[in-house]
Amino acid sequence: MNFLVIGLSHKTAPVELRERISFSSDDPGGVLRAITALPGISEGMILSTCNRVEVYAASGDPAGGCACLQRFMAEHHGLDEAQLKPHLYIHSGRDAIRHLFRVASSLDSMILGEPQILGQLKEAYNLAESSCTAGPVLNRLLPRAFAAAKRVRNETAIAQHAVSVSYAAVELARKIFGDLAGKSVMIVGAGKMCELAARHLTGQNIGEVLVTNRTLARAQSLAEQFGGRAIPFAEFPLYLNQADIVLTSTAAGGLLLTRAQLEQIIRQRKNRPMFLIDIAVPRNIDPEVNHIDNVYLYDIDDLNGVIETNLRERRKAAKKAEDIIEQEIVRFYSWLRSLEATPMIVALRRQVEDIRRTETEKTLGSLQHLDAGDRRAVEALTRAIVNKVLHSPLSVLKRAGDDITGEIYLEAVRRLFDLNPDSQQTGGDSVEKDADSKQDLTS
């Protein structure tokens, strides 16, 4: 059984194509079941976001399975395969596992280190589970992908540096004030950037939020979202002395705040620090206010500089994250080889025990003069010889999962002793279960 990934992303396809290929059906479970009904596909899961559309599948026929999935993706969205094919990437086996782990860890995201993709991947897996299209392969791989992503976030700094303008502004505010709890905020403007900044700020347990905009209704709408208070645009300078943090982003086309105004306001505040964030272009705040003591002004270029520095830090962290991914892949394959070792050991022991028992019975049949005690001694002797002979090779096989040569040892034992553990019957369920696990995941 092989693990496959087929899809496209912001790296390979324009947004127009990503929109057309997006799986946003009213019946996502039905789409998943249609995928697993394709020839050679036994399991299926879809990850569909604004930046990527990927199908994860298990298949006993990788080439045929990929061809079926490619055809399905085109036909389901009313496209010719020729339109789709140049934008697709296809991975199988170890490469597919690496891709999944990198996606889960946000190493393949448009914004390196962003946290949303892991949640989206978990939702996709939950849907596959509830639709009964996740089986042994996905049920083992996805938890390992989540574990890899957790390690990356815990052991690297990949998510610790702001890489959006709105969050960079909050990060700078924290550097100025240390703790934003109880700090009052004024937002001048009601566009998307103001909304994002307000969302980040309100997550810091801030105090009062004042919102102003030329259109009062828009200011009221934004204020309601964050439990704030809207004030008329013409009156906002009167409230500035109450604000510890001021964020401006309007299309005013000129300065809303001058140095003279801020000098008066900082006196009213008795020189308590003010943090001003001007993300408007053209700028809303006179850059000269930076010369006022206890006034800290940052414009869009300052924030972009912070973002670029932080991106460099995330790229450094990504190198360590890639090492973690490789460690997790090795760990997964080590576990996979250990699954094969268990039924192989049982099969080898059974075969040798069958030979020992048969030959011992033959010998004892020709030694009728031996009493019961002598016969037990012969049985014990033959068992001891078998155990001594098998001890060293079985110890090596038990460690097969910890050594890159484990696969070679297992294959050698299989061939030398003509073993086929997957087809052998046992008195218990555990060996059969292990054999099935190995068969499901071998790639």
Curated annotation (Swiss-Prot):
Enzyme Commission code: 1.2.1.70
Domain of life from the UniProt record: Bacteria
Keywords of this entry: NADP, Oxidoreductase, Porphyrin biosynthesis
Residues binding substrate: T49, C50, N51, R52, S109, E114, P115, Q116, Q120
Site entry: Important for activity: H99
Ligand binding (NADP(+)): G189, A190, G191, K192, M193, C194
PANTHER family documented for this protein: GLUTAMYL-TRNA REDUCTASE (PTHR43013:SF1)
Record's subunit section: Homodimer.
Function: Catalyzes the NADPH-dependent reduction of glutamyl-tRNA(Glu) to glutamate 1-semialdehyde (GSA).
Protein name: Glutamyl-tRNA reductase
Organism listed in the record: Syntrophotalea carbinolica (strain DSM 2380 / NBRC 103641 / GraBd1) (Pelobacter carbinolicus)
